[in-house]
From Swiss-Prot:
It comes from Corynebacterium diphtheriae (strain ATCC 700971 / NCTC 13129 / Biotype gravis). PANTHER family: DNA REPLICATION AND REPAIR PROTEIN RECF. This is DNA replication and repair protein RecF. InterPro entries: DNA-binding_RecF, DNA-binding_RecF_CS, P-loop_NTPase, RecF/RecN/SMC_N, RecF_2. GO terms for molecular function: ATP binding; single-stranded DNA binding. Keywords: ATP-binding, Cytoplasm, DNA damage, DNA repair, DNA replication, DNA-binding, Nucleotide-binding, SOS response. Transmembrane segments: none annotated. It is found in: Cytoplasm. GO terms for cellular component: cytoplasm. Its main location: cytoplasm. Coiled coil: none annotated. The RecF protein is involved in DNA metabolism; it is required for DNA replication and normal SOS inducibility. RecF binds preferentially to single-stranded, linear DNA. It also seems to bind ATP. ATP binds at residues 30-37. Pfam families: SMC_N.
Length: 397
């Protein structure tokens, strides 16, 4: 897969931007704060319906505007599709493919496939469990877009159930019994949460089983002198670690039973304590968790291994994802830079952002790449980003 054209309107610092892209390596060069990361962030947003930098869509809309528009034309095995996304500062986003309006932006999942390396990847090891859950869910939704909808539905049911738990806890504290209306309704929400949660837990266990060997091999290539790396999924819904993975229905039954066991504690705390929203991905080096025990270099090697495993897993499915390297070379030592560059030779398209050319490995600067230069200009509406403003044409090397 490769992206043939990207068009932005009022996305962060870009009032307008249209750039034609080609297979191979494309480099966006610009000083920090000039807006080069915003370009690849827009592509990643269309791919995953989320930003790797912020949690709220309002930050993506240029100051003073009500909405932003991102259009990405992707070519996959000769078939061309254009994904359009209208991002609103307030209200629901809208999406379409070519000229067809979609019922939900979630229907865009799978149209554009990307794997992003960025400085924020350190959170995959050092961050909270939510970062690692998000990593797994992105991989799952890219491969099976339907499960992206399951995750969204689960989050909605979870919010409603947590609200009910707070109501039930307040009722008990006021002296009402277990037959109070709010409390009796929990059974219905438990069933819905377990049905959706069982599907998510099964999907995560399944993808971790596939990613595990890829992570191990990638880490061994990047850091052959280090301890072996492996990953494992840790769930609040226990099951016997057997060769054959339990079905979604079996996970659903196990989760429902666990919810029953924890009901009193959940009502007391007013929060759901069981389910995929409480799970984690253990990242292990040797016999110790990488978080807290890995050196800075080992942490970066593990983060790269997780992303490389993601890339190869999607590639094994039959489609080369677009590889995005966002200001990541500046964070790596020479050895890790070269290991990462070796992967770029395998990808159909690579998009790279860098503040200065010195951040790039020699093997990359010597290869044929398409270069674009990002600058800024001050206007009455504020500072805006410009692409190739000096000449008005792309710079190829």
């Amino acid at each position: 897969m490769y992206i043939r054209e990207l068009s932005l309107r009022d996305f962060r610092s870009w009032p307008e931007c249209t750039v034609t892209l080609e297979p191979g390596v494309t480099l966006f060069v610009g000083r920090n704060g000039f807006g080069k990361t915003n370009i690849v962030e827009a592509i990643g947003y269309v791919a995953h319906l989320g930003s790797h930098r912020v949690f709220h869509d309002s930050a993506l809309v240029r100051q003073g505007k009500e909405s932003a528009r991102v259009s990405v034309t992707a070519v996959n095995h000769g078939r061309e599709l254009t994904a359009h996304l209208l991002i609103k500062a307030k209200g629901a986003n809208q999406a379409q493919i070519n000229r067809t309006r979609l019922k939900s932006p979630r229907e865009l999942l799978g149209v554009v496939k990307t794997v992003l390396f960025s400085p924020e990847d350190l959170s995959l090891v050092r961050g909270d469990p939510a970062e690692r859950r998000r990593y797994l869910d992105h991989v799952i939704a890219t491969r099976k877009p339907r499960l992206g909808g399951v995750k969204a539905d689960y989050d909605k049911v979870l919010r409603q159930r947590n609200s009910l738990l707070k109501t039930a806890g307040a009722a008990l504290r006021r002296g009402y019994g277990a037959d109070d209306g709010a409390l009796s309704t929990l059974d219905v929400w438990d069933s819905q949460l377990a049905r959706l949660g069982g599907q998510l837990i099964h999907a995560r266990h399944s993808v971790v089983r596939e990613l595990g060997p890829l992570v191990h091999d990638a880490y061994a290539r990047i850091a052959p002198e280090s301890r072996p790396a492996h990953i494992r999924y840790v769930s609040t819904v226990p099951f016997a670690d057997v060769v054959e993975l339990p079905s979604p229905e079996e996970f659903e039954a196990a989760m429902l039973a666990e919810l029953g066991q924890c009901r009193d504690k959940e009502i007391d705390r007013g929060v759901s304590l069981v389910g995929p929203h409480r799970d984690d991905l253990d990242v292990v080096l040797g016999d110790y968790p990488a978080k807290g025990f890995a050196s800075h270099g080992e942490t970066w090697s593990m983060c790269l291994s997780l992303r490389l495993a993601e890339f190869h897993l999607l590639r094994n499915d039959g489609t080369d994802p677009v590889l995005i390297l966002d200001d990541v070379f500046a964070e790596l030592d020479t050895q890790r830079r070269e290991k990462l560059v070796s992967v770029t030779a395998e990808a159909e398209q690579v998009l790279i952002t860098a503040a200065v050319g010195d951040d790039l490995p020699d093997t990359l600067t010597e290869s044929a790449v398409h270069r674009h230069f990002v600058s800024v200009a001050d206007t009455p509406e504020g500072r805006i980003s410009l692409l190739d403003a000096a000449t008005g044409v792309p710079h190829d090397g």
